[in-house]
From Swiss-Prot:
<feature type="transmembrane region" description="Helical; Name=12">
    <location>
        <begin position="679"/>
        <end position="699"/>
    </location>
</feature>
<dbReference type="InterPro" id="IPR005829">
    <property type="entry name" value="Sugar_transporter_CS"/>
</dbReference>
<protein>
    <recommendedName>
        <fullName>Monosaccharide-sensing protein 2</fullName>
    </recommendedName>
</protein>
<feature type="transmembrane region" description="Helical; Name=10">
    <location>
        <begin position="610"/>
        <end position="630"/>
    </location>
</feature>
<dbReference type="InterPro" id="IPR003663">
    <property type="entry name" value="Sugar/inositol_transpt"/>
</dbReference>
<feature type="transmembrane region" description="Helical; Name=7">
    <location>
        <begin position="507"/>
        <end position="527"/>
    </location>
</feature>
<feature type="transmembrane region" description="Helical; Name=1">
    <location>
        <begin position="1"/>
        <end position="21"/>
    </location>
</feature>
<keyword id="KW-0597">Phosphoprotein</keyword>
<keyword id="KW-0472">Membrane</keyword>
<keyword id="KW-0926">Vacuole</keyword>
<dbReference type="GO" id="GO:0000325">
    <property type="term" value="C:plant-type vacuole"/>
</dbReference>
<keyword id="KW-0812">Transmembrane</keyword>
<feature type="transmembrane region" description="Helical; Name=11">
    <location>
        <begin position="650"/>
        <end position="670"/>
    </location>
</feature>
<feature type="compositionally biased region" description="Acidic residues">
    <location>
        <begin position="347"/>
        <end position="363"/>
    </location>
</feature>
<keyword id="KW-0813">Transport</keyword>
<keyword id="KW-0762">Sugar transport</keyword>
<feature type="transmembrane region" description="Helical; Name=5">
    <location>
        <begin position="139"/>
        <end position="159"/>
    </location>
</feature>
Length: 729
């Protein structure tokens, strides 16, 4: 686990450089315009500041596709080189044109970092701390701004401040970032798997997780390569084997899955329910809140919510279902505690899959499973390294005459992956290992109370899909999972065709929508207004009495502004995986609205200057703190989680391009808006956008905390089909 943390910290150094650059140009431009006489030519002054935005926008148009082609690590190395070269060019800068070139190169580096660091961290982080690690870029970016403002403020106190030195000092941290990317950062294991480089991916995962056994996660990565596979939600009834009767409208006995508990003589069965629809499953297992909200809520949000919702009777978290691995059960009710459950017999024919061994193998695989087991038992049980509360046994109790056994592995965040293998005899009578079985179905350890009672029967829902297959020949040793087709085969074909997949389109709506609303929520306007606010609060007079010039005072004020963000971001890092992304957004956006409305009122109503300064200062501080807790990091975190591996780079590039275009629009429209509708009008407009943002998050943005990336993308696929089905009804 420490390996993933250190790798995320190293990658987030790139965002420190971004924040560093943003702050240094804000201070250096005060001296640049004096040297080049730009007071009468504000367009050139604005171009110097904006050239970094232009460079970031240009590079973003191709960064995602190239990252999917060449890898994440080479692009991060390139960004460090661009930072380094750009800083040296700015340090030299004999004229404005060379300075513009240096700013453009620097912008290229910024664009690559903003696009790729969230992808890289998401693809290397374990699910249980992915939110924390993906908040690091926000923290290091703000930290870089604070350090840079302090440096520029110190230089501004010199008799002859050098703007070239202010900008050129960037080459030192950029050189550090270069060495980190070249000698410390590994390639993303998910990208390696997508290219069929399995041994490299396995070694990287072993380093990131700090353990040798990463087979479960390797299987997960392969299973997550497909896009748009047919996945269905099925309903099951689980109960004691001798008590399940026809009264529960269950299928015939041949369809049952038999389970064995740890207690001798105790067995249970899971049987499919006839006629259970996807939407009926959601209505039973979804939250009571979503039922009250009616049809406005996206079914996708309800589906994700069912994973995290607490079961009211037992206090346990709902176990959830999962893709490409067959059946996975969502269970509530009283069950024997601390039991491990294994499959005994699975009936129901699976589909045939081609094998790269040729036509001599006609076996299919037993559907594997991913399950989430988060119950009230968590309080009583020690945490494992990867947060798994219950596990499957690698050797089944029922392994016997048929040569069947069950295997299972943790994949982080309390999730497990498991499948069943069979042994068969070849022509000479020798047993052949590793051939998948011919039937599908799987079951998970059940949460619950202290024993069986009246509530022996429980409802269960399963997300069932067909697996993406590959062969053990990929590793030339033990198999990683039940698959037969080389992973690189799944990445062939048109990327643009995959963008039309309903699940991908739904994810793009969420990602692009968040980026647009974030930029129009007012952060640039509040940053622009902050020096004026603090001046009114008397900070400027206090600093001038200390002998600090107005230019130096503005830099110090900006440093103080960024400093107050850091504790708030630290709190967000803690809450991102506890409360969740959606919850943080829904909680913090109302405070942004209130802060903006107070700023509107303070600028419309005539009041005592001291009262005005206090209200404005408190509002600005609250706005900054709660913005960086929610709307600052959450959009990038969510965008890095909701797209399939095959198109993750290009989809995040689309989201990042939206970010930069909106950033440019907001930056250049702000002076015009201030002149036309005034400060109160601008903040009022931002407050309206924040209200729209809250509604958008409430209706469209699901909770993704603690879920493996491959599970998230499969949920988007299922949710999109559910939404289409709901429209057609």
């Amino acid at each position: 686990m420490s390996g993933a943390v250190l790798v995320a910290i190293a990658a987030a150094v790139g965002n420190l450089l971004q924040g560093w650059d943003n702050a240094t140009i804000a201070g250096a431009v005060l001296y640049i315009k004096k040297e080049f006489n730009l007071e009468s030519n504000p367009s050139v002054e604005g171009l110097i500041v904006a050239m970094s935005l232009i460079g970031a926008t240009l590079i973003t148009t191709c960064s995602g596709g190239v990252a999917d082609w060449l890898g994440r690590r080479p692009m991060l190395i390139l960004s460090s080189i661009l930072y380094f070269v750009g800083s040296l060019v700015m340090l030299w800068s004999p004229n404005v044109y060379v300075l513009l070139l240096g700013r453009l190169l620097d912008g290229f580096g910024v664009g690559l970092v903003v696009t790729l660091v969230p992808i890289y961290i998401s693809e290397t982080a374990p699910p249980e701390i992915r939110g924390l690690l993906n908040t690091l870029p926000q923290f290091t970016g703000s930290g870089g701004m604070f350090l840079s403002y302090c440096m520029v403020f110190g230089m501004s106190l010199m008799p002859s401040p050098s703007w070239r030195l202010m900008l050129g000092v960037l080459f030192i941290p950029s050189l550090v970032f270069f060495f980190l990317t070249v000698f410390f950062l590994p390639e993303s294991p998910r990208w390696l798997v997508s290219k069929g480089r399995m041994l490299e991916a396995k070694r990287v995962l072993q380093r990131l997780r700090g353990r040798e056994d990463v087979s479960g996660e390797m299987a997960l990565l392969v299973e997550g390569l497909g896009i748009g596979g047919e996945t269905t939600i099925e309903e099951y009834i689980i109960g004691p084997a001798d008590e399940v009767t026809d009264d529960h409208d269950i299928a015939v006995d041949k369809d049952q899955i038999k389970l064995y508990g740890a207690e001798e003589g105790l067995s249970w069965v899971a049987r499919p329910v006839k006629g259970g629809s996807t939407m009926s499953v959601l209505s039973r297992h979804g939250s009571t809140m979503s039922r009250r909200q009616g049809s406005l809520i996206d079914p996708l949000v309800t589906l994700f919510g069912s994973v995290h919702e607490k079961m009211p009777d037992t206090g346990s978290m709902r176990s959830a279902l999962f893709p490409h691995f067959g059946s996975m059960f969502s269970v509530g009710g009283n069950q024997p505690r601390h039991e491990d459950w294994d499959e005994e017999n699975l009936v129901g024919e699976g589909e045939d899959y081609p094998s790269d061994h040729g036509d001599d193998s006609e076996d299919d695989l037993h559907s594997p499973l991913i399950s989430r087991q988060t119950t009230s038992m968590e309080k009583d049980m020690p945490h494992t390294a990867h947060g798994t509360l219950s596990t499957f046994r690698h050797g089944s109790q029922v392994q016997g005459a048929q040569g069947e056994g069950a295997g299972s592995m943790g994949i982080g965040g309390g999730w497990q992956v498991a499948w069943k293998w069979t042994e068969r005899e070849d022509e000479s009578g020798q047993k052949e290992e590793g051939f998948p079985g011919s039937r599908r179905g799987s079951i998970v350890s059940l949460p619950g109370g202290d024993g069986t009672g009246e509530a022996d029967f429980v409802q269960a829902s399963a997300l069932v899909s067909q697996p993406a297959l590959y062969s053990k020949d990929l590793l030339k040793e033990h198999t990683i999972g039940p698959a037969m087709v080389h992973p690189s085969e799944t990445t062939k074909g048109s990327i643009w065709h995959d963008l039309h997949d309903p699940g991908v389109k739904r994810a793009l709506v969420v990602g692009v929508g968040l980026q647009i609303l974030q930029q129009f929520s007012g952060i640039n306007g509040v940053l622009y207004y902050t020096p004026q606010i603090l001046e009114q609060a008397g900070v400027g007079i206090l600093l001038s009495n200390m002998g600090i010039s107005s230019s130096s005072a503005s830099l110090l004020i900006s440093a103080l502004t960024t400093f107050v963000m850091l504790p708030a971001i630290a709190v967000a890092m803690r809450l991102m995986d506890l409360s969740g992304r959606r919850t943080l957004l829904l909680t913090t956006i109302p405070i942004l609205i209130a802060s903006l409305l107070v700023l509107v009122i303070s600028n419309l109503v005539h009041m005592n200057s001291i009262v005005h300064a206090v209200l404005s200062t408190v509002s600005v501080v609250l706005y900054f703190c709660f913005f960086v807790m929610g709307f600052g990091p959450a959009p990038n975190i969510l965008c890095s989680e909701i797209f399939p591996t095959r198109v993750r780079g290009i989809c995040i590039a689309i989201c990042a391009l939206t970010f930069w275009i909106c950033d440019i629009i907001v930056t250049y429209s702000l002076p015009v808006l201030l002149k036309s509708i005034g400060l109160a009008g601008v903040f009022g407009m931002y407050a309206i956008v924040c209200c729209i943002s809250w509604v958008f998050v409430f209706i469209k943005v699901p909770e993704t905390k603690g879920m493996p990336l491959e599970v998230i993308t499969e949920f988007f696929s299922v949710g999109a089909r559910q939404a289409e089905a709901a429209k057609n009804e």
